[in-house]
Amino acid sequence: MPFSEPGKTKFQVDLRRHLRNQDISDNLVHLICEIAEASKYVINAVRTGDLGVAGTSNLYGEEQLALDVLSDRIIRKRLIHSGVVCNIASEEMDEIFQAQADADGLYSVAYDPLDGSSLVDVNLAVGTIVSIYEGCNLLQKGRNQVAAMYILYGPRVSLVYSVGKGVHEFTMNHLMEYTLSRENVTMKPDGDIYSPGGLRKKYLPETEKFVQHLESKGSKLRYSGGFVPDINQVLMKGKGIFMYPALNGSPNGKLRVLFELNPMAYLIENAGGAATDGKTPILDIEPQSLDQRAPIFIGCSNDVATAMEFMGG
C-alpha cells in the first residue's frame, strides 16, 4: 500500500518502517537494515579512503584496490555480527565464509562490495550489489532469492531494494538516514536508451546486428562503465536496455551470475522488465561455481525479447 495519497505532502518513511510493511520476517528486516548501515561506512571510505592498490588479487586474478578490500571488510563484519546470516560469499573472497551453522530463520548473502571501484579515482559513481537467499545454499537459481538490493554512491546515495513485492528507492538524507523517495518503480515495455558493455569490435555478428537495430530505431547510447549506475539509469527512467554480451574470446561475457546478474535481474523483473543471457532468463540459471559468468541483456521486456530474437534464443 502506498504511504501517501495523490495531492498530499509525502511524509518521510524510513527504510525499517517500509520493510515492516512488506510482510517479511523480522530477521530479513534486520538483515537488510544491517546492510544499509554498512553502506554508510562504505560511502565514507569512498569519499575519504585510499585510492591505491591493496597488493592482493581476488578469486578472478584481478588486482584488488584498497577500497575493494576495505568495503568488503566493512560489509562482511556487519553480516557476521547480524546474527541472522549463515553463509557469506563476496566477489573479493576466494570461498564461501560460514558465519554460523545452519539453523531456522537464517539467510545467506552474496555481494559485490564495491562494483566499479576502478572508477572512484576519476570520481564516477560506484555501488554495492547484494543478493539474499533463505537458508545456507548460495549456489541456486536467482529466482529463489528472497531479496536483492543495490546502493548507488553517486551525487546522491540511493538504496534500491525488492523482496518480491515491487521495487523501492530510498535516498540518504543529511542525517545519513534512508528515506523513501520512489515506491513501486516500474519499467515501460519499450525504451530508447541502451548501455552496451564490452569492446564493440569483439561483438559477435548477432550482437552487432542487434546494436545496429537499436541505433536505427533512434536509441541513445548511455554508458558510464559502472554496472550499478547504468542499471539504475535504466530502472529509474523506466526504459532502455543494458547489455554485456558474449565476446570473441569471452563467450560468457564478464559479469558474475551470483554477485551481479542475479540481484539486478531480480530487481528488474520485479519492476516489470526482463533479463536474459540471450537464450535463458538470468534468474533460471543454476550457478555451478562462485565465479560463473554469463552474458546479459537486461531492461525493458520488449527490448530484451528483441535481443533474444537476434541471439537466436
UniProtKB/Swiss-Prot annotation:
It catalyses: beta-D-fructose 1,6-bisphosphate + H2O = beta-D-fructose 6-phosphate + phosphate. Binds 2 magnesium ions per subunit. It comes from the Bacteria. GO terms for biological process: fructose 1,6-bisphosphate metabolic process; fructose 6-phosphate metabolic process; fructose metabolic process; gluconeogenesis. Mg(2+) 2 binds at residues 112, 115, 260. Keywords: Carbohydrate metabolism, Cytoplasm, Hydrolase, Magnesium, Metal-binding. Mg(2+) 1 binds at residues 91, 112, 114. GO terms for molecular function: fructose 1,6-bisphosphate 1-phosphatase activity; magnesium ion binding. The keyword Metal-binding applies. This is Fructose-1,6-bisphosphatase class 1.
